[in-house]
A protein has these predicted regions:
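Residues lining hydrophobic/aromatic ligand-binding pockets adjacent to catalytic sites
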Residues: 1-265
């Protein structure tokens, strides 16, 4: 399983991350599955790496994290991207989140912890996202562990291998929707395999450029997870699918686990 980092990731991100664990947890409740996070790609703007989508009184609303632009940012490794705290984005983000979810059933229960992460001044986008992702893994009680990749995997240059191989194929078309995409400058030739053992799965387990705000995906449909849950503004806009994971947690609380992993019911 290979994913890109994301800021308050959408449900499709968490559905993909929990897929392998969901297949094993019923028979092995103590199981923990590794989910690999691409740590050696370059920064790509207009992606979930620094934005999330929530449901507000005015419809869908994007919350973005501004980053420091030093030199050629699009040839900067994702782990080196610094958050721009000179912009008052934290205040605006908290205001937007509170406005959207103050009446949801579990907002008050989780609000302080979520806002504490935003207020902590974490210097890099990578570290900020990791803190957020691990918070939701813990609160939803998912048996997954985030493991940063040790080297970059080039999407175009890895072929198919049999299921169960020590190196599973990571194969996806060149992400043309992200014009700034390029192999990191420190990668000379070819792609190196991820460490660890995988099982063959949807999209050959490479979701890095499948989950994108400007590109629809069928992950929730493929996993039979495109189903409604309570949303504050559903009466006005209808159910809105694949929003930030905070939408699920603030509205469903402890039931979020059963939504993402229905095999536990």
């Amino acid at each position: 399983m290979l994913l890109s980092t994301a800021f308050f990731p959408p449900l499709s991100w968490f559905a993909a991350a929990a897929e392998d664990w969901g297949r094993t947890v019923a028979s092995n409740p103590s199981s923990v599955c590794d989910v690999y996070l691409e740590a050696h790609e370059n920064y790509c703007k207009q992606s979930y790496r620094n934005r999330c989508i929530i449901a507000s009184a005015n419809g869908l609303e994007a919350i973005s994290v501004p980053v420091v632009h030093d030199g050629d940012i699009f040839h900067t490794p994702i782990t080196d991207i610094r958050v721009d705290y000179e912009d008052p984005w934290v205040k605006k983000a908290k205001r937007a989140i509170e406005s959207a979810y103050s009446t949801s059933a579990y907002f008050e229960y989780y609000k302080d912890d979520v806002f504490a992460i935003l207020d902590s001044g974490i210097p890099t986008l990578w570290e900020l996202n990791l803190a957020i992702i691990n918070f939701f893994i813990k609160k939803i009680r998912l048996g997954i562990r985030i493991v940063p990749t040790t080297t970059f995997v080039i999407p175009d240059q890895i072929g198919n291998l049999p299921s169960g191989s020590t190196f599973d194929p990571v194969r996806f078309a060149h992400p043309s929707h992200c014009k700034q995409w390029a192999p990191p400058v420190h990668i000379a030739t070819g792609g190196m395999p991820l460490e660890g053992s995988f099982q063959q799965g949807r999209y050959d387990k490479d979701y890095r450029n499948v989950i994108h705000p400007k590109k629809e995906n069928t992950i929730l449909e493929d996993m039979n997870l495109k189903k409604p849950y309570f949303q504050v503004f559903a009466g006005k806009y209808g159910f809105q699918s694949d929003l930030s994971v905070m939408d699920l947690l603030f509205n469903e609380g402890p039931q979020s686990l059963l939504y993402l992993v229905p095999s536990l019911v």
